[in-house]
Amino acid sequence: MMAVTNGVIHASSREPLFSFGVIADVQYADIPDGRSFLGVPRYYRHSISVLQRAVSTWNKQHNIKFSINFGDIIDGYCPKDKSLWAVQKVLDEFEKFDGPTYHMFGNHCLYNLPRGKLVSLLKMPTDSDRAYYDFSPCPEYRFVVLDAYDFSALGWPRDHPVTAEAMKFLEEKNPNSDKNSPDGLVGVDRRFVMFNGGVGKEQLSWLNDVLQDASARRQNVILCSHLPMDPGSASFAALMWNYDEVMAIVRQYKCVKACFAGHDHKGGHSVDSHGVHHRTLEAALECPPGTSAFGHIEVYPDKLLLVGSDKMADTEMCFEP
C-alpha cells in the first residue's frame, strides 16, 4: 500500500481496511471553455475526460470499494434544455465504475434541476426527498453525507418557506444587491452569499443522533459535504453558512476524524483545534486537457491517506489519540 512523507509516496507495510475513490466539481457542460469570476480557466468539455480517467484508474486498482462524488456534477452555464442530458451523460461515466458511487449536490446542480429530481437521479440512499444520509462500509467506520443546501435560496420552489427564510437570512447578512457578491463582507462573513447554503435544524438534530450512535459503536466518522467547514481549508467565501453550528455538534463527540468537501476549486487542508482534518478537494473542472484531479483514500484504523493524481495533492491525515 502507499504512504506519504513530505509529499513523497512510498510503500506501507500495512494493508488498509478499505479504499475509496474521490472526485469533486466535474461541472461538465457542452460549451466552450471559460473562466471563473476570479479569472481561472475552466474546461467544461474536458472535465468529463477527468472523470473517465478516474473511473478507469479506480477499476484498475481493484481494491476501491466505492467512490464519492463531492457535488457540482454539471455547470450552471449548461444550457437548461440540456441539463437532464448532461447529468445523465456524467452519471453514465460513474456507472462504469465497478462499485457504488455516493453523490451529494452542490450549487451548480441546483442551478440546473430541482432538488427532488436530483435526489432521484443521483440515487441517494434515502427513504424520502432528503439529500443527507449515512453508510458504514465496515464496522470500524461510518460516512456521513450532509446536504449543505438544506437551508438555501437554491433548489427549493420560489414560493417555498425555505426559500423565503433563506432570502431573509441573506438580506440580514449581505447588504449587496447581488447576493452572490461578497464585496464589503469581512473575514468569514464573506460566506454569506447565495451560492452557499447551510444545514437545517432537522438535519442538525439527525447529525447529532448519528454521531451519538457512532460514538456508542466506537466508529470513526468521515463527514462529507459539498461546502467546506473550516476557515483554514478553504476561501472564506466558500464556507458553509452555519459551519460553526455543525462543528459545535461534531465537537461534542470524538468520533469525527476528517471532513471532506469540494466547492473551493483550488483545494486545501487544515487541522482544526480539536484535531479534525479538513480536506477540500481540487476541482476536476479546472484541469487543462491532459491533466487530472481525482484520487483514492486508503483507510487505516489510525489515519487516512489521500493518494492524488496530478492536480490533487497527496495528503496523510493521522488521527490524534
From Swiss-Prot:
GO MF entries: 2',3'-cyclic-nucleotide 2'-phosphodiesterase activity; ADP-ribose diphosphatase activity; CDP-glycerol diphosphatase activity; manganese ion binding
Enzyme Commission numbers on file: 3.6.1.13, 3.6.1.16, 3.6.1.53
Protein's UniProt keywords contain Nucleus: no
Record InterPro entries: Calcineurin-like_PHP_ApaH, Metallo-depent_PP-like, MPP_ADPRM
Leader peptide range in chain numbering: none
Domain of life: Eukaryota
Residues the record lists as binding Zn(2+) 1: 25, 27, 72, 265
Protein name: Manganese-dependent ADP-ribose/CDP-alcohol diphosphatase
Organism: Oryza sativa subsp. japonica
